[in-house]
A protein has these predicted regions:
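Non-catalytic terminal accessory/regulatory regions of metabolic enzymes
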Residues: 1-41
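Hydrophobic faces of well-ordered beta-strands that scaffold small-molecule active sites
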Residues: 40-45, 67-71, 105-107, 125-127, ...
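Active-site mouth loops of central-metabolism enzymes
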Residues: 39-56, 80-84, 104-108, 128-129, ...
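N-terminal small/glycine-rich loop or linker at the start of catalytic domains
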Residues: 24-46, 77-80, 205-214
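Catalytic beta/alpha-barrel core
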Residues: 86, 102-111, 123-136, 147-158, ...
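Alpha-helix-loop-beta-strand connector modules within alpha/beta enzyme cores
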Residues: 83-107, 141-147, 198-212, 236, ...
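Glycine-rich, proline-tolerant flexible connector loops at the mouths of alpha/beta enzymes
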Residues: 70-88, 247-257
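Catalytic alpha/beta core domains of metabolic enzymes, predominantly
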Residues: 29, 34, 144-247
Length: 277
């Protein structure tokens, strides 16, 4: 059972506006409404690997109908020898992509000391699953005047997830979007990367008024599974999707980060069409 005494700022029953109804807080991100009646799609590369790659994908996801552009400039990798991102140069590339496409930017911040820098470029600051309980980081973004995308930790309970949101809200920032991205289970790695926990969507919406979206890319780890996972997530009540995209003709072997899960822009367009029917 979720102990709602551990969080009250993001608890539905503690806020008179949302008590006793199923309304969701609508969060504005540079003109994009998240939490409304329209399914929001955030799409882009796992990592900003080059200017050419990022601009190509940005134009493609814009044409496919995406609302926002995702892309990692700072990458939390399991091994210190893996590609760590282009860092500030990556942020500059994202800024150029925004200028050329008009798409607001979503990118991850990993360090409390970098919140100000990343916030200069990003319209929506992402807290990744590995940092869901990085409490100094949660406090810092809570003090920053930008909406926050809070991913669920790899093994986090709903209570732990909402307590992390409470850390942010306690500092004054209640512009928080929750993102389910798959959890580690006994079968993780056997036929998928993680397990997409669609069961968490309804109890999350009962417990809090914060909008919830789903990442079908990291949760499945396989491009072929992303379309069905996307449609299932929306059917279960998710209010948006966070999807990784690669170039239409890009060789997966050349991709530096999560090469198996990115979908092609042509597939993205089909997903967007299907979830907005």
């Amino acid at each position: 059972m979720v102990d709602k005494k551990l969080y009250h700022l993001v608890n539905r029953e503690d806020q008179s506006e949302y008590r006793g109804n199923s309304r969701t807080k609508v969060i504005q991100v540079s003109g994009v409404e998240i939490g409304g009646t329209r399914s929001v799609v955030i799409a882009g590369p796992c990592a900003v690997e080059s200017r050419e790659q990022t601009l190509e994908i940005a134009r493609a996801v814009k044409q496919a109908g995406a609302d926002m552009l995702r892309g990692g400039a700072y990458k939390p990798r399991t091994s210190p020898y893996e590609f760590q991102g282009l860092r500030e140069k990556g942020l500059e590339i994202l800024a150029e992509a925004k200028e050329k496409t008009g798409l607001p930017i979503v990118t991850e911040v990993m360090d409390p000391r970098l919140v100000g820098l990343v916030g200069q470029y990003a319209d929506l600051l992402q807290i990744g699953s590995r940092n869901m309980q990085n409490f100094p980081l949660l406090v810092e973004v809570g003090r920053y005047n930008k909406p926050i995308l809070l991913k669920r930790g790899l093994c986090a309970t709903l209570e732990e997830w909402l307590c992390s949101a409470e850390y942010i809200a306690k500092e004054g920032n209640t512009e928080i979007i929750l993102c389910e991205r798959g959890v580690r289970t006994a079968t993780s790695g056997e036929y998928d990367r993680y397990t997409l926990d669609l069961n968490v969507i309804r109890p999350t919406k009962v417990s809090t008024f914060l909008p919830i979206i789903v990442d079908p890319s990291h949760s499945t780890g396989t491009a072929a599974m992303v379309p069905d996972a996307s449609r299932a997530a929306i059917s279960c009540g998710a209010q948006g999707l966070l999807i990784e995209v690669i170039g239409e003709h890009t060789d997966r072997k050349t991709i530096k980060c999560d090469e198996t899960q990115g979908i092609r822009p042509s597939i993205l367009k089909k997903i967007i069409t299907s979830v907005r029917v």
